[in-house]
Amino acid sequence: MNASLAKRYAKALFDLAREQGTLDQVEAEVRLLDEVLHATPELMDLLTNPAVSDSELAQLLKDSFGDMTAIVVNTLLVMVENDRAAEVRALPRYVRELINDYRGIAEGIVTSAYPLSATDLKDVELVFGQKLGKTLQLKNVVDEEVIGGLRVQVGYTTYDDTIETKLTRLERELLNA
């Protein structure tokens, strides 16, 4: 897979959706596309199989995603036509990143020892959103190895306030003292 190629197609799709005022619909459709590709690895196998012709792939995509907006379907078809079907897998992620960036939204993960309530999750989103100057959409991941505290990852930035990290820092300070 060539990420830069997938990003180019994502940018073209994003630009068209923005111009046409269909960002919400395109966002929903690429989320669905992502879910379908995750749920059916056989589809990805077909898209990357050199024995399957471009016309067969195009028909498969029309049959599978023909109810989506024309710009989404046409983007998929152009990718197949240009022998870029393998990049279809990455398209939804890059489109969502562009849409989120345009809207000032960042997605991330908050790791905790136990599931956070909806209220606690919103509080974490607000606090870290203010630090980053963005609206955050965090997904809570439970990691039983986290004794307590939180680890928040947004993009390439990690805020680690777990007890494990605090103990590690304390140990280093004591050893260096």
Curated annotation (Swiss-Prot):
SUPFAM superfamilies: N-terminal domain of the delta subunit of the F1F0-ATP synthase
The protein's role, per its UniProt record: F(1)F(0) ATP synthase produces ATP from ADP in the presence of a proton or sodium gradient. F-type ATPases consist of two structural domains, F(1) containing the extramembraneous catalytic core and F(0) containing the membrane proton channel, linked together by a central stalk and a peripheral stalk. During catalysis, ATP synthesis in the catalytic domain of F(1) is coupled via a rotary mechanism of the central stalk subunits to proton translocation.
Homology family: Belongs to the ATPase delta chain family.
GO molecular function: proton-transporting ATP synthase activity, rotational mechanism
Pfam families, per the entry: OSCP (PF00213)
Annotated transmembrane regions: none
Organism in which the protein naturally occurs: Exiguobacterium sp. (strain ATCC BAA-1283 / AT1b)
Topology in membrane: Peripheral membrane protein
GO cellular component: plasma membrane; proton-transporting ATP synthase complex
Entry keywords, A to Z: ATP synthesis, Cell membrane, CF(1), Hydrogen ion transport, Ion transport, Membrane, Transport
UniProt keyword Transmembrane present: no
Subunit structure: F-type ATPases have 2 components, F(1) - the catalytic core - and F(0) - the membrane proton channel. F(1) has five subunits: alpha(3), beta(3), gamma(1), delta(1), epsilon(1). F(0) has three main subunits: a(1), b(2) and c(10-14). The alpha and beta chains form an alternating ring which encloses part of the gamma chain. F(1) is attached to F(0) by a central stalk formed by the gamma and epsilon chains, while a peripheral stalk is formed by the delta and b chains.
Protein name in the entry: ATP synthase subunit delta
NCBIfam families: ATP_synt_delta, PRK05758.2-4
Keyword Membrane included in the entry's annotation: yes
Compartment list: Cell membrane
Coiled-coil regions listed in the entry: none
